[in-house]
Amino acid sequence: MTVYLLAGGGTAGHVNPLLAVADELRAREPGSTILVLGTREGLESRLVPARGYELLTIARLPFPRRPDGAAVRFAPAFARAVGQIRRMIAERGIDVVVGFGGYAAAPAYAAARRPGVPVVVHEANASPGLANRLGARVAAAVGITFPGTALGPRAEVVGMPLRREIATLDRAAVRDAARAELGLDADRPTLLVTGGSTGARSLNRTVVQVAERITATGAQILHIVGGAQEFTDPGVERYHVVGYSDRMELAIAAADLVVSRAGAGALSELTAVGVPAVYVPYPVGNGEQAVNVRGVVAAGGGIVVADADFTPDWVLAHVLPLLSDPAALARMSQAAASVGTRDGAARMADLVRDAVAARPSRPAARR
């Protein structure tokens, strides 16, 4: 049976597609062994074991951005990680390395080269990260979420691998039950605000200032502030604050409109099930979130606003009227669904299994 090593992690944007592909591979090949490579500090340390997979860990290795002491220490630390992963490959008889970006992916790509283990890469964002740019050079196959992502001639659009809870979600059928489980009223317009697994300080700061104005119209808010953020609940009626949600499918099903960052994972989940959204791209980094959102905005399924412009006045002028306009929300929902995909995990699993089938035979694992 096949032994898979899935490498990635750090945030939900890396962990969720990894778990979606793991679940798809396990469903197709129940006797296979699926190992996950990550770090102790990342979200994977909690989510991977909870999903029933074995987590192997290496030290967290951020790529250095400046020629300083961290850059000097990086090379030997990276070499140690590569050696550690090579031993894992030999001892566990790993047949393929599947990388999703993040701290664990780059050394896994490097480690797979010498023993001739095929590498398959999935890139979530429209603008690829450094680890996956390196991995794509040696990969047998590359899956991308967005058309036009520059990862070489082997890149194939597969969409975002989504957890089954999202990929099979029927919002209309479960909306009332989702609202009940989340402690929300069944019949009120519902705004979901989320900044991702670590939260978004600027979104939190703005929304808390206008929460009372929004709920005064009869609407309700579910605000996921993020586990890494300090936040004081103001105690406004119908303003529900939670730190983090492991059941985002419930939150998405409950929502009429979402305010969100434009990370590839969140965007792909919302478009897959046709949820209208206001996207506020993260203003730091390589700008990938602003690129991610172009397709859904062009289709009419979302609105984009710069982080600096996402002010209380902007929310009252744009979000509040939209939340009370069911016809506009219905049009946006249909447009969002037109650019979403639900079968990314299956298509990515096809790439992985094809790479395994094409690999040359290798010696058995050491026992």
Swiss-Prot record:
UDP-N-acetyl-alpha-D-glucosamine binds at residues 11-13, 125, 163, 197, 289. Keywords: Cell cycle, Cell division, Cell membrane, Cell shape, Cell wall biogenesis/degradation, Glycosyltransferase, Membrane, Peptidoglycan synthesis, Transferase. GO terms for molecular function: UDP-N-acetyl-D-glucosamine:N-acetylmuramoyl-L-alanyl-D-glutamyl-meso-2,6-diaminopimelyl-D-alanyl-D-alanine-diphosphoundecaprenol 4-beta-N-acetylglucosaminlytransferase activity; undecaprenyldiphospho-muramoylpentapeptide beta-N-acetylglucosaminyltransferase activity. GO terms for cellular component: plasma membrane. It comes from the Bacteria. It holds the Pfam family Glyco_tran_28_C. Pathway: Cell wall biogenesis; peptidoglycan biosynthesis. It is a peripheral membrane protein. It catalyses: di-trans,octa-cis-undecaprenyl diphospho-N-acetyl-alpha-D-muramoyl-L-alanyl-D-glutamyl-meso-2,6-diaminopimeloyl-D-alanyl-D-alanine + UDP-N-acetyl-alpha-D-glucosamine = di-trans,octa-cis-undecaprenyl diphospho-[N-acetyl-alpha-D-glucosaminyl-(1->4)]-N-acetyl-alpha-D-muramoyl-L-alanyl-D-glutamyl-meso-2,6-diaminopimeloyl-D-alanyl-D-alanine + UDP + H(+). Belongs to the glycosyltransferase 28 family. MurG subfamily. PANTHER family: GLYCOSYLTRANSFERASE (PTHR21015:SF22), UDP-N-ACETYLGLUCOSAMINE--N-ACETYLMURAMYL-(PENTAPEPTIDE) PYROPHOSPHORYL-UNDECAPRENOL N-ACETYLGLUCOSAMINE TRANSFERASE 1 (PTHR21015). NCBIfam families: murG (TIGR01133). This is UDP-N-acetylglucosamine--N-acetylmuramyl-(pentapeptide) pyrophosphoryl-undecaprenol N-acetylglucosamine transferase. It comes from Clavibacter michiganensis subsp. michiganensis (strain NCPPB 382).
